[in-house]
Amino acid sequence: MPVTHERGYLIPAIDSDSVDYLRCAVQLARSIRRWHPDANITALTVKQCSDPVFDQVIPLPHGDLGGYRNDWQVFDASPYRQTIKLEADMIAAGPVDHWWTLFERRDVVVSLGARDFYDRPAESRYYRKIFDQNDLPDVYNAITYWRLSATAKEFFSLVRSIFEHWTVYKTLLKFSEESPSTDVVYAMAAKIMGPESVTLPQKLGPNIVHMKRHIIPTQSHDWTQELVWETDPFRINTVAQWGLVHYHVKDWTLHE
């Protein structure tokens, strides 16, 4: 993809059988624009979309390969010299443009760790057993930055290779997944390249508020039925949120 702008946010929005990720991407883009009206935002999707919240809507450059296996295409698809890729099912609960200053001297930054809605580091390892069992860095691809560079090209080439040759790579892991998640693939790529080359220290770099049951924690999967949430500002159980909130319940809408 030709470079059209220096910086911008790229939101992959490839629907699954059960999730309308383009709807999620629209909600995320609107939340970013609330704080940064002039931000450049691109959706990456196989669907038609004319929503003006996006500056560009572009297709997958190599076609729909199915689910997570599309992820490596973000490097080829981005129209930016510096890109922040964001998972679609999140909300920007506050300004995030300071990330550019934080990231700009690095070639690749994948976020480390997660927080609960009280802004405490996530302690539960329920969803991260494969990381602990294999000494993988605790990365979350939900926030990933790169600038056009040899390092970024190498990283996403590794991501592609791991997805395409998973039957080989999974033999390197204990208790490997039958189908790899993007976080596991990013973690393997980071470990091969050296985590310090593609991450920032957890206390320095941004990380998501993760609203999964065992992190929050709640009794059920659907936190929206147990916790009280408010808008303007976005608060959960009266606690004001900041940064990016990964709401996880895919059909949740901030503004009803």
PLM feature segments, named:
Residues 15-18, 23-24, 43, 77, ...:
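Catalytic phosphate/metal-binding cores of nucleic-acid and nucleotide-processing enzymes, i.e., regions
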Residues 1-7, 11, 43, 53-56, ...:
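A glycosyltransferase accessory/donor-loop signature
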Residues 49, 59, 69-121:
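GT-A fold catalytic core of metal-dependent nucleotide-sugar glycosyltransferases
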Residues 8-73, 227, 247, 251, ...:
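Glycine/proline-rich, flexible active-site/cofactor-binding loop segments
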Residues 5, 39, 80-82, 106, ...:
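Short coil/turn segments at beta-strand junctions that form active-site/ligand-binding loops
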Residues 49-51, 63-67, 116-118, 204-210:
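A short acidic, often aromatic-flanked loop/helix-cap motif at beta-alpha or helix-coil junctions
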Residues 65-72, 120-132:
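Short acidic (Asp/Glu) patches
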Residues 42-45, 84-87, 92, 108-111, ...:
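A structural signal for short, well-ordered beta-strand segments and their strand-loop junctions
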